[in-house]
């Protein structure tokens, strides 16, 4: 707690039998895929882009296999994984920050030990879901899109989104929502998140 953790640190903990975790399938869920890509970036030394040649790096397949050998439960959905974690007595979970917050809220309400969030400094992957519009010349649909966009970007709605444990930008959280992003759970509300 309180120290920077690398993906290599996680790998060492798995190899020594100190760490097992739940993670969604990289082929079925964005959170699992994002974690897998983050792990690859870290194991490759954080190249600008992962190339086919990078994936042929000697030892990479063995390292990623060892890393994923720490998965003791998988799921096809991030929410399902959270639910499994809450009912299964597992030790750790790789998931979205907002779902760790949600799990901790439930664990705390039940009087159980909460999770401590770890952000691997060299293997962090972000889920950024932009809203887009394809212009097909329909001004009525375009206006509906612009109205929705304005609504979603309003201060009130951005605050409501943040109250669910979801960051609405890369530069921390608002003062009024700090109680959701609890530092005693390892959450770093002031951390500028970047992959």
Label each residue range with its predicted role.
Residues 26-31, 98-101, 122-125, 137-138:
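Solvent-exposed loop/turn segments at secondary-structure junctions
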Residues 20-23, 91-96, 132:
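Structural recognition of the beta-strand scaffold that forms the well-ordered cores
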Residues 1-5, 41-50, 137-145:
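Short helix-loop capping/hinge motifs at secondary-structure junctions, enriched
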Residues 41, 46-119:
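Ligand-binding pocket segment of bilobal, Venus flytrap-like solute-binding proteins
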Residues 134-195:
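Extracellular/periplasmic juxtamembrane helices and adjacent flexible linkers that interface
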Residues 15, 39-48, 86, 105, ...:
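Sec-exported extracytoplasmic/periplasmic mature domains
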Residues 1-42:
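A conserved helix-loop-strand patch within extracytoplasmic ligand-binding domains
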Residues 20-26, 68-71, 134-138:
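Second-shell loop/turn segments in exported
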């Amino acid at each position: 707690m309180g120290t920077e953790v690398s993906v290599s640190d996680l790998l060492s903990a798995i190899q020594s039998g100190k760490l097992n975790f739940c993670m969604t399938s990289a082929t079925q869920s964005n959170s699992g895929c994002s974690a897998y890509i983050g792990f690859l970036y870290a194991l490759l030394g954080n190249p600008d882009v992962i190339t086919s040649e990078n994936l042929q790096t000697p030892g990479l397949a063995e390292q990623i296999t060892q890393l994923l050998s720490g998965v003791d439960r998988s799921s096809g959905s991030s929410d399902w994984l959270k639910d499994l974690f809450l009912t299964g007595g597992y030790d750790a979970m790789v998931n979205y920050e907002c779902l760790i917050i949600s799990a901790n809220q439930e664990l705390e309400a039940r009087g159980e030990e909460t999770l401590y969030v770890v952000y691997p400094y060299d293997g962090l992957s972000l889920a950024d879901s932009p809203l887009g519009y394809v212009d097909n010349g329909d001004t009525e649909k375009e206006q509906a899109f612009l109205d929705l966009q304005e609504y979603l970007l309003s201060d009130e709605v951005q605050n409501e989104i943040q109250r669910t444990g979801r960051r609405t930008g890369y530069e921390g959280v608002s003062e009024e929502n700090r109680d959701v992003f609890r530092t005693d759970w390892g959450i770093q509300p002031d951390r500028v998140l970047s992959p």
